[in-house]
A protein has these predicted regions:
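Core of compact, soluble alpha-helical bundle domains
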Residues: 1-128
Length: 128
């Protein structure tokens, strides 16, 4: 926090270590979700990509998107998801996993709302 300004979402979430802990749980949850793995393209991707690398990139992206000092170095959301042919139902399953993770860690409602808005802004690049 600088010059008396309100803390960023990144700061309110507790910074990189707290964000990484939440992302770790979310990615484990998503990678094991049978609703998502019913899509053979998603299932194959979940078994092709090492979880640690996936978690790193998602942590980097969340930190960047919430106002942290990190820079996201991965591919665009469209480029990294278009070949997976993710449906609206699969998107809803992901959102359910996301909500379960936020609730598990007791993320306050105001911060949840901001995070959900960030996630919602990516839907058009992810869902077919």
């Amino acid at each position: 926090m600088t010059n008396g300004s309100a803390p960023s979402l990144y700061e309110r979430l507790g910074g990189v270590y707290s964000i990484a802990t939440v992302v770790d749980d979310l990615i484990d949850r998503v990678m094991a979700d049978p609703r998502l793995n019913a899509n053979p393209l998603v299932d194959e991707a979940h078994h092709r990509v090492p979880p640690a690398g996936f978690k790193y990139l998602v942590t980097e992206m969340v930190c960047w998107a919430t106002g942290g000092p990190q820079q996201y170095t991965g591919r665009s959301m469209r480029e990294s998801h278009e070949h997976l042919k993710i449906t609206a139902a699969e998107w809803e399953a992901f959102l359910d996993d996301f909500q379960q993770t936020l609730d598990k860690f007791g993320v306050p409602e105001a911060e949840q709302d901001e995070l959900k808005a960030i996630v919602a802004s990516t839907r058009g690049d992810i869902v077919i």
